[in-house]
Amino acid sequence: MTWRVGVATGAGTCGELVQGVLSDGRSFHVTCPINKGSRVVLALRESRQWRVEGVPAGRQKLERAIRLTAETLAGGPYEINVEHSSELEVGKGLGSSTADILAGARATASALGLNMDEDRVAALAASIEVSDGSMYPEIITFDGRAGVPIRRYDWWPQFAVVLVNPTTSIDTDSVDFTDQAPLSAQYDRIVADLDLAVAERDGGAFARAAGESARLNQLFVMNPWLDVLERETERLGADGVNVAHTGTCLGMLFLLPAATDAHATEKIDAVRRRASSAARRLRAVLPDGLRVGLAETPVWRESRAGSLDVGADPLY
């Protein structure tokens, strides 16, 4: 029986820009996908019984995604050999498990010669965990329990992110956000503010919303480094700060100019230099053991015809 090979990636996140509960009871988050993630290479062939080998310890959701995808798309059973690599640590709020699920599902579909669109991948991910919305190549408002977008925007800002990664971790599956319900009116307002920000092409409003949500989240998951990062954000002239609402990582946000701006390349390079300088500053002032890195969120571009082109700059 012939082996068939599939290769795919899944984007990670720097936490979320916003996360909470709306007045209609839906849990939501505004995604912060980044250009770091997981990669899966797998080979499969028909077999008399299921066998999945090569999945690293602690990555059980990856195995579930691979097998569930194969069962859903083609039945099975299959023998599957997996090679997995990831830039994302577990328990930090970097979207590691969702990135694994995305990479595993897409690689399996690719090996089978089939495609899974974003909505189908989202539904599969939500059947395995309360997922991030990083299967969509953009900033969206997402219901991770139902696996469906709440808002898909016709514009979103792009950020250079200085990612601060403490050594501590959290069991993200154990965090209970039902206590956020009394604050639902505030979260309704934040989502409405983002709708207005999209209409006005106001990227700064996304950064401000992220900072407000980070501060509200201190009531539920205390991040001991938020105060420090807020002070450094003001000192360094960054546009905002965000956190992993169910993890430990934080981000300092630098709004990148639109690719359509005059002299866009020079302006974007200047912001990236500022972000790099901020990363060096944070490495100097933060205690040893807090890792500091750089990432970026997906770019938005509009074609000359005015249609949305989300594939112009892939995450990988």
Language-model regions, residue ranges each:
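ATP-dependent small-molecule kinase catalytic core of the GHMP/sugar-kinase superfamily
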Residues: M116-D239, L253-Y316
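ATP-binding N-lobe of GHMP and related small-molecule kinases
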Residues: M1-K92, D309-Y316
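Active-site catalytic microenvironments for nucleophilic, acid-base chemistry
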Residues: L68, T72, A107-G113, S127
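DPxDG-like acidic metal-binding loop motif
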Residues: K92-E118, S134
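Fold-independent oxyanion-binding glycine-rich loops
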Residues: G10-C14, Q19-G20, I34, V55, ...
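A generic structural motif
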Residues: N81-E83, T248-L253
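Short beta-strand
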Residues: G240-A244
